[in-house]
Amino acid sequence: MRKKLIAGNWKMNGSLAANEALVKGLRVGVGASVCQVALCVPSVYLAQCQALLVGTAIALGAQDLSQHEVGAFTGEISGAMLQEFGVRYCIVGHSERRQYHFETDALVAAKAQRALACGITPIVCVGETLAEREAGRTEEVVKRQLAAVIHANGHCISEVVVAYEPVWAIGTGKTASIEQAQQVHSVLRQQLQAASIQADRIQIIYGGSMNAANAAELLAQPDIDGGLVGGASLKVPDFLSIIASAC
């Protein structure tokens, strides 16, 4: 039985004071959760959040890492650096990185490989745009994106988390229907099963505007193993509600 994973993606939000208040609220509410909880925070706040999360069941996560191990790559952050701060999860290939930073499938696969090499679980994001969905290309797109990661990481694919994030549902308030979300998760599960005998242990989480109102129904689906939560992860009551739905 796969445990549910609820990962908060703070994106480019937060401040020292706000972070402290948020994590303190979560510390009280999460307790000894039976599901897995992570916070993927801006890199400048990793040290602060590492200290704030000591003694909790909440794992620390990052939002990106370099595909390079070390070297003259100004502005980049390596997996080894993240590892020193106790980072356990790292988002790779988020649609905002693909869109605004022109990250390709091959680059995302290389970043996932680098995370795994550093003992960090990559949360590999895949998803289609509205135009791709309306053109009937959803399955083609998500399978292509995931195939690159499978090809680059081979037997290690069982160590990743996959996040399906319909791009048209991120930050828009729109959500894929329960049926749409489960259908894509099922496609991804089948692709993983063809690639690994351990596919049934791989968590596939949903990242398209999961919130307190829709979390329970989404998380009840057989192939939805958690959520990559954006805006709702910045609000203690909402994030705790989603965690409760998963646990």
From Swiss-Prot:
UniProt cross-references to SUPFAM superfamilies, sorted A to Z: Triosephosphate isomerase (TIM)
InterPro entries on file: Aldolase_TIM (IPR013785), TIM_sf (IPR035990), TrioseP_Isoase_bac/euk (IPR022896), Triosephosphate_isomerase (IPR000652), Triosephosphate_isomerase_AS (IPR020861)
Keyword hit for Phosphoprotein: no
GO terms for biological process, alphabetical: gluconeogenesis; glyceraldehyde-3-phosphate biosynthetic process; glycerol catabolic process; glycolytic process
GO cellular component, one term: cytosol
UniProt entry keywords in alphabetical sequence: Cytoplasm, Gluconeogenesis, Glycolysis, Isomerase
GO molecular function: triose-phosphate isomerase activity
Residues the entry annotates as binding substrate: N9, W10, K11, G171, S209, G230, G231
Subcellular location per the Swiss-Prot or TrEMBL entry: Cytoplasm
Chief localisation class: cytoplasm
Family annotation (PROSITE patterns): TIM_1, TIM_2
Catalytic activity field: D-glyceraldehyde 3-phosphate = dihydroxyacetone phosphate
Annotated catalytic residues: H94, E165
Pathway involvement of the protein, from the record: Carbohydrate biosynthesis; gluconeogenesis; Carbohydrate degradation; glycolysis; D-glyceraldehyde 3-phosphate from glycerone phosphate: step 1/1
EC number(s) stated in the UniProt entry for this protein: 5.3.1.1
Subunit architecture: Homodimer.
Similarity comment text for this entry: Belongs to the triosephosphate isomerase family.
Record function comment: Involved in the gluconeogenesis. Catalyzes stereospecifically the conversion of dihydroxyacetone phosphate (DHAP) to D-glyceraldehyde-3-phosphate (G3P).
NCBIfam families: tim (TIGR00419)
Name of this chain's protein: Triosephosphate isomerase
Record organism: Albidiferax ferrireducens (strain ATCC BAA-621 / DSM 15236 / T118) (Rhodoferax ferrireducens)
Name of the gene: tpiA
